């Protein structure tokens, strides 16, 4: 009898308070989504990209990653040209040459059309300098020098120190062929979330999901026990 009355109360609430029912369903869906996302974050502790990386830099470097960087045949001094210089730190693979334990610098000039730019930006030149750190210091600093309209307007996700930007001593050639900068990189630019960040984010999302699901259950139980139709509702049905 009690279960029938509770079901009847829920049916009356559904019939006479649709906005409340819709709000409860929305909270329930959000809670279930939070449970699923939180569980995913807690079980996948590696390989997730940081959402704070600007997508325009990702697209720019993916286009740049289709090119080959050709080292100079002899040691020369390169001058940074262009009113705007941006430096960012990436993880690149330049091969295991005999000088892999030394900091090396490679330089190339590219046109906007080579990285997918159109219009007036297609003919603009960009001077790219890569400073490959020694094995003890992982990471490669990439410096882009050119007019501001060619480079992405947002700040680079991982800035690189501009120490020694004025002049760059270029290293000798590392073999007979040009070097494919991103030949071994699946993602051109990515900053992975650490396991601590994933655990913190996953636990908070999971807790929020549990809270929303419990809130929906509490609303349903309260409605089933406490909701009663107004007396005038029965009188109106009797008159009809």
UniProtKB/Swiss-Prot annotation:
Any single biological process term in GO: apoptotic process
Topology of this chain in the membrane: Single-pass membrane protein
Superkingdom field: Eukaryota
Residues exposed to the Cytoplasmic side: 226-240
UniProt key word Transmembrane helix: yes
Keywords: Apoptosis, Cell membrane, Glycoprotein, Membrane, Receptor, Signal, Transmembrane, Transmembrane helix
Signal peptide residue numbers: 1-38
All ranges on the Extracellular side of the membrane: 39-204
Protein purpose: Cell death receptor specific for IGFBP3, may mediate caspase-8-dependent apoptosis upon ligand binding.
UniProt cross-references to PANTHER family, sorted A to Z: INSULIN-LIKE GROWTH FACTOR-BINDING PROTEIN 3 RECEPTOR (PTHR16002:SF6), TRANSMEMBRANE PROTEIN 248-LIKE (PTHR16002)
Name used for this protein in its record: Insulin-like growth factor-binding protein 3 receptor
Source organism per UniProt: Mus musculus (Mouse)
Lineage summary: Eukaryota, Metazoa, Chordata, Craniata, Vertebrata
Gene from which this protein is expressed: Tmem219
């Amino acid at each position: 009898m009690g279960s029938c009355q509770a079901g009847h109360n829920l049916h009356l609430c559904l019939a006479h308070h649709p906005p409340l029912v819709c709000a409860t369903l929305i909270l329930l869906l959000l809670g279930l989504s939070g449970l699923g996302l939180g569980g995913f974050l807690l079980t996948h502790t590696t390989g997730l990209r940081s959402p704070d990386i600007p997508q325009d830099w990702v697209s720019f470097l993916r286009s740049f990653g289709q090119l080959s960087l050709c080292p100079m045949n002899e040691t020369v001094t390169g001058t940074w040209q262009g009113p705007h210089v941006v430096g960012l730190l990436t993880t690149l693979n330049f091969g295991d040459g005999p000088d892999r334990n030394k900091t090396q610098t490679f330089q190339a000039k590219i046109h906007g059309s080579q990285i997918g730019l159109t219009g007036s930006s297609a003919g603009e030149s960009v001077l790219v300098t890569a400073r490959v750190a020694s094995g003890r210091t992982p990471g490669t600093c990439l410096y882009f020098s050119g007019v501001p309209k060619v480079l992405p307007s947002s700040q680079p996700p991982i800035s690189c120190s501009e120490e020694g930007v004025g002049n760059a001593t270029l290293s000798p050639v590392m073999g007979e062929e040009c070097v494919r900068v991103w030949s071994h990189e699946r993602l051109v630019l990515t900053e992975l979330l650490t396991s601590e960040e994933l655990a913190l984010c996953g636990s908070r999302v999971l807790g929020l999901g549990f809270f929303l699901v419990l809130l929906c259950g509490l609303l349903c139980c309260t409605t089933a026990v406490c909701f009663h139709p107004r007396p005038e509702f029965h009188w109106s049905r009797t008159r009809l």
